[in-house]
From Swiss-Prot:
The gene is bna4. Catalyzes the hydroxylation of L-kynurenine (L-Kyn) to form 3-hydroxy-L-kynurenine (L-3OHKyn). Required for synthesis of quinolinic acid. GO terms for cellular component: mitochondrial outer membrane. Keywords: FAD, Flavoprotein, Membrane, Mitochondrion, Mitochondrion outer membrane, Monooxygenase, NADP, Oxidoreductase, Pyridine nucleotide biosynthesis. InterPro entries: FAD-bd (IPR002938), FAD/NAD-bd_sf (IPR036188), Kynurenine_monooxygenase (IPR027545). It catalyses: L-kynurenine + NADPH + O2 + H(+) = 3-hydroxy-L-kynurenine + NADP(+) + H2O. One of its GO terms (biological process) is kynurenine metabolic process. This is Kynurenine 3-monooxygenase. SUPFAM superfamilies: FAD/NAD(P)-binding domain. Pathway: Cofactor biosynthesis; NAD(+) biosynthesis; quinolinate from L-kynurenine: step 1/3.
Length: 512
């Protein structure tokens, strides 16, 4: 019968960033007719990139993002992207002690695994090039989503070309194009237009937070010989209690740096160029003049914008069978775990896995059956992903405290050492650091939190029991032999051994 003829689904994706582009590849691989609409111009155009990307925190690509790319079945694409990344095997903590600059490495992983620094435009260009050579994908740049009806499955876009004044119609409005779709994916960032229009149809719980921290980008130029000025295989951190300065390597042998600090500090630093130099000299020793000339530091601070950090959660991530949101549109996270990109790419893998699981791509199913299957799949996506994206949102906030100051505390180092020893020498226990679970596995973020808390409880009980036992034994010995084991001798013995442990593990160890 005529009504049983199967047609490909039409998928409209709003946003041509890395997450939207990967979603288009997944949908195209399943035979969908895909249209990608992007507000900005072609992101591969060099004249477009500075406007959108140069004032952007560098991206970190780790296991979750890589795994999502591999599941697109574009092996060469994944290889090409990874070839242009720079592996970072750990943090390099910088400081100054008694007038001497020092640095100490802290490996991310006891097994030597790395996260990858990637240039956003390089990643985006590779994905867009792949889409351009995919026959069932169409790209539309300079198109702004102005409206959507998610019951009628229609959307409206304005086409705005830079340099061209839009010609209004008789109603004095810029002409719009109407687009039909089977379902839409919103990958259009934290200020998502898709989410805005979806909230007119779905009862969405929405939480947005601007933390009291601004960020500003700086650049460490290559040496005169075109080499890196500091180790390229580390994320460099100059920590402070309320602020920090970080540096990530770039392919051109420079470092993209970011100053994170409360707004009050930015106001203070902006009041005088000399205050900026004094602040860096005290809190970020070794940055200027060693890595960034003072004049360049002042110019970059004055020229580059001082931008806020946004964190948002929402639930659900879909409405009916017609729309779902992914990436920052669904869960903008703070950049302090390096998981914003990875969580967004993982959204795509999870979404299409549940679409497959619910037989949305069963070619023998009717249009109505596929619609019903899609609605169930979108609900499953929301049920799974909301718990996980809320979890990584919370973890990212917590990691800001760790990066600013926790990396220097003995308690952090002690727990890290114990967990890494157990991971390396007793792997059957399944013990890992929280960071390893987040960055080097595909475990659900919500499960990572549960496991980390369980490990923390066990460690706390273990250390507490050890301490109580030691005190009990010491008390018994002092009671039996008060002259030989006086309290003063016992305190000296403990301090001597604590000092030995400190020197052995915390001052002379780089967690290699």
């Amino acid at each position: 019968m005529a009504d049983t003829v199967r047609k490909p689904q039409k998928v409209v994706i709003v946003g041509a960033g890395p997450v939207g582009s990967l979603a288009a590849l997944y949908a195209a691989a399943r035979g969908d007719e895909v249209e990608v609409y992007e507000l900005r111009g072609d992101l591969r155009d060099p004249s477009t990139i500075p406007l959108n990307f140069t004032k952007s925190i560098n991206l970190a690509l780790s296991e979750r993002g890589i795994n999502a790319m591999k599941h697109s079945n574009r092996e060469e694409l994944t290889k090409n992207v990874l070839r242009d990344t720079i592996p970072m095997y750990g943090r390099m903590i910088h400081g100054k002690d008694r007038g001497q600059l020092w640095e100490a490495a802290q490996a991310y992983d006891v097994h030597g695994r790395a996260i990858n620094a990637v240039d956003r435009s390089t990643l985006n260009n590779a994905l867009l090039d792949e889409l351009e050579h995919t026959p069932n994908v169409k790209l539309f740049f300079n198109h702004k989503l102005t409206g959507a009806d998610f019951r009628a499955n229609k959307a409206w876009f304005e086409r705005r070309v830079p340099g061209e004044a839009p010609l209004p119609n008789s109603a004095n409005r810029v002409p719009e194009i109407e687009v039909d779709f089977d379902f839409m994916l919103g990958a259009d960032g934290a200020h998502s237009a898709v989410r805005y229009h979806m909230m007119k149809f779905a009862r969405v719980d929405y939480q947005q937070e601007y933390i009291d921290t601004l960020w500003c980008e700086f650049r460490i130029a290559p040496t005169e010989n075109g080499e890196f000025r500091i180790s390229p295989n580390h994320l460099h951190i100059w920590p402070g209690r309320e602020f920090m300065f970080i540096a990530l390597p770039s392919a051109d042998k420079s470092f993209t740096c970011t100053l994170f600090a409360p707004a009050v500090h930015y106001t203070y630093l902006a009041s005088s160029p000399q205050k900026l130099l004094d602040f860096f000299d005290v809190h970020f020793p070794g940055v200027s003049p060693e890595l960034i000339p003072p004049a360049d530091l002042q110019e970059q601070f004055a020229t580059n914008p001082h931008l806020p950090l946004i964190s948002l959660k929402c639930k659900p991530h879909h409405f009916g069978s017609s729309v779902a949101i992914v990436g920052d549109a669904a869960h903008a996270v703070l950049p302090f775990y390096g998981q914003g990109l990875n969580a967004g790419l993982e959204d795509i893998r999870v979404l299409f896995e549940v679409l497959d699981k619910h037989s949305v791509y069963d070619l023998d199913a009717s249009h109505e059956a596929r619609r019903e299957a899609r609605e169930k799949a979108f609900q499953a996506y929301t049920d799974q992903r909301c718990a996980d994206t809320h979890a990584i949102n919370d973890l990212s906030k917590e990691n800001y405290v760790e990066m600013r100051w926790g990396v220097k505390t003995p308690l952090y180092k002690l727990r890290k050492s114990i967990e890494e020893i157990l991971d390396r020498y007793v792997p059957s226990l399944g013990w890992q650091t929280q960071y390893s679970r987040v960055s080097f596995s595909n475990q659900r973020y919500s499960d990572v939190i549960k496991l980390a808390r369980r490990q923390g409880t066990v460690l706390g009980l273990g250390l507490g029991s050890t301490f109580i036992t030691a005190v009990g034994v010491a008390g018994y010995m002092m009671w039996k032999n008060p002259k030989q084991y006086s309290p003063l001798c016992f305190m000296r013995y403990c301090l001597r051994h604590v000092s030995h442990i400190w020197v052995k593990f915390f001052r002379n160890t780089a967690y290699a």
